[in-house]
Amino acid sequence: MPRSVWKGPFCDNYVIKLARRARGNPNVLIKIRSRRSVILPAFVGYTFGVYNGKVFIPVKVNENMVGHKFGEFSPTRTFNGHSGDRKVNKK
């Protein structure tokens, strides 16, 4: 279920503080670990490094991302593919 409208979007306070510090320079990578925070309109144009459990993945925020969460743009699992042609052909 989605969040109630009357509560408003959730964003960790330290994410907002880091974005305010980088207000003058939008090219700086803002490293965050909060995948649960919602992308606010004030974050458009900034580059966030979203932690996926191993590395910080750079995410350049644009207008289409507003309202989504940071975790949606940094995958945590890698898919190596299925074996495919390795199967033995029985004759």
Curated annotation (Swiss-Prot):
Domain of life from the UniProt record: Bacteria
Alphabetical list of InterPro entries matching this protein: Ribosomal_uS19, Ribosomal_uS19_bac-type, Ribosomal_uS19_CS, Ribosomal_uS19_SF
Keyword Ribonucleoprotein: yes
GO CC field: cytoplasm; small ribosomal subunit
Keyword rRNA-binding: yes
Keywords, ordered alphabetically: Ribonucleoprotein, Ribosomal protein, RNA-binding, rRNA-binding
One matching Pfam family: Ribosomal_S19
GO molecular function, one term: structural constituent of ribosome
Gene Ontology biological process: ribosomal small subunit assembly; translation
Job of this protein: Protein S19 forms a complex with S13 that binds strongly to the 16S ribosomal RNA.
Family: Belongs to the universal ribosomal protein uS19 family.
HAMAP family reported for this sequence: Ribosomal_uS19 (MF_00531)
PANTHER family in the record: RIBOSOMAL PROTEIN S19P FAMILY MEMBER, SMALL RIBOSOMAL SUBUNIT PROTEIN US19M
Name listed for the protein in its UniProt record: Small ribosomal subunit protein uS19
